[in-house]
């Protein structure tokens, strides 16, 4: 543990942020995985719905500072491409 009071506080706040970011990141990954499963199953309606849900989750994570906006844009672009390639 750090000796300086401000560093002790930073350790606590960093841990809180880490836990919060971890849960948000996990939720986003879950939504992306559900989208990929829908695409793999060939279910266009479910994939379209899940694309919207995953894109929204990515946008929210960007506003919370979990993902960089370019990272989210790349992920959304990849999902849109995968969706458009569906027959």
From Swiss-Prot:
The keyword rRNA-binding applies. GO terms for cellular component: cytosol; small ribosomal subunit. Keywords: Ribonucleoprotein, Ribosomal protein, RNA-binding, rRNA-binding. One of its GO terms (biological process) is translation. Residues 1-10 have a biased composition (Basic residues). Gene3D superfamilies: Ribosomal protein S20 (1.20.58.110). Residues 1-27 are annotated as: Disordered. InterPro entries: Ribosomal_bS20 (IPR002583), Ribosomal_bS20_sf (IPR036510). GO terms for molecular function: small ribosomal subunit rRNA binding; structural constituent of ribosome. Coiled coil: none annotated. NCBIfam families: S20. Binds directly to 16S ribosomal RNA. Belongs to the bacterial ribosomal protein bS20 family. This is Small ribosomal subunit protein bS20. It comes from Corynebacterium aurimucosum (strain ATCC 700975 / DSM 44827 / CIP 107346 / CN-1) (Corynebacterium nigricans).
